[in-house]
Amino acid sequence: MDQGSSSCCRIDHRMDFQQGLISTIHDYGLGNLDLAEFRRQLKHCPTALLIPCLMEEFSRPALGLIREVLSDLSGLHELVIALAADSSDDVAAAETFFRGMPFPVRVHWTNGPAVRELLESMRGLGLDVTGPAGKGWAVWQGLGVACREAEVIGLFDADIRTFSPAYPERMLRPLLDPSHGVAYVKAYYSRLSLETQALQGRATRLFVGPLLTALAQIFGPVPYLRYLQAFRYPLAGEFAFRRDLAMNLRIPCDWGLEIGLLSEVYRHVALSRIAQVDLGLFDHKHKALGNQPSEGLQKMAGEILGTVLRGLMEHEGRSLASEQIPTLEVLYRRVGEDHVRQFGLDAAINRLPYNRHNEELAVQSFATLLRPGVQGLMTTPVAHQLPSWSRLLSCTHGLQSDLVTAGARPTRSTPTLHQRPSLRHRGGSAPRPQPQPAAPISPVVQ
């Protein structure tokens, strides 16, 4: 795409200056990125980045790009990699991959034997924190580790293919200046495939958006639904918060994680302290629709549906009656089909490829999930959530420190990350270090 066509694709986006129920930080396309000032802000406010990660991500280019971008953030207090790995050798390889960064990097082995033993011991206190394994469990552990010292914590996925210095800068700056009064920041973006430039984000575009519109027609403009609708990309997995908020959030353990966290934020924070920030064009791994409700985007949508409806119960005392299920099905299909037509127009004028038939099939598949999803919720209205860290520390004060110890790679010969020699020379700042490739991992991300 040449420069002219790129500007064309972005003009709508850059000229948007509308505000809504929550503060919106737009990208006006001016490129006003000041990394030197951002580094100074980081040094004055202990800030950690948390990246939940599977070992398979180390063989993909995205994580190498993230490492390269972050290697320029010398003021960062800590990078926490919440890693699911099969062996201590994998953990060692991950440590090698991130060696040479200008800040401490802690690779936390989320499913290591010591962590499992520690969390299993919590059953004696009546607490089930042993899983299920997944992003929610990794985020929960990573927050426990990161919140020991950091005042601000930002979370990014490990598969972002468009990661740039603007991502952490725009996500964290609203929280680094206390005068803004912001406690929580969530990303939004335009999901486009790097290869084909096709619209992505079907779960958000074709399920969550139409679902919230349909529910608002059934229940009216109740505050909780208006709140969810205020987010331009409610399923964004990139967000940041102040430590006091992070410590008080329960963490969902399924595909409802992002909506569930929004529900928790709604519970704890005034709307005036919530913001969303535009990260521009964004691409990461894509998930297939799936051939049945237990697969792919269909499984994700089913769990998101349950999370949205539980939020209505919790915050509004409202639930769908059996006789309202057909209404929801009809409304969702109508709104979903309207969205397909609208996205088709959007794609056509922006000269983006668009398969309307496949989009219609996705809406049909999502619609079939509504009835069993609502009925299942009536049978099991309470979902498993991991307790907040403030709740845990009220009954076992040393759990955070114990978790850090348990999550470290078991070895006596290699110093822990916080014992490594300082990266700063006595005479001044060290030159920017070059991250080293992870030799034990094949293929190596260069």
Predicted regions and their residues:
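Terminal low-complexity segments of carbohydrate-biosynthetic enzymes
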Residues: 2, 8-27, 102, 283-285, ...
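Active-site-proximal specificity loops/subdomain of glycosyltransferases
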Residues: 90-150
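Short beta-strand-to-loop acidic/aromatic patch adjacent to the donor-nucleotide binding site
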Residues: 149-161
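Conserved donor-nucleotide/metal-binding helix-loop-beta segment in metal-dependent transferases, i.e.
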Residues: 163-189, 193
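A recurrent flexible, glycine/aromatic-enriched loop bordering the glycosyltransferase active site
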Residues: 195-205, 216-238
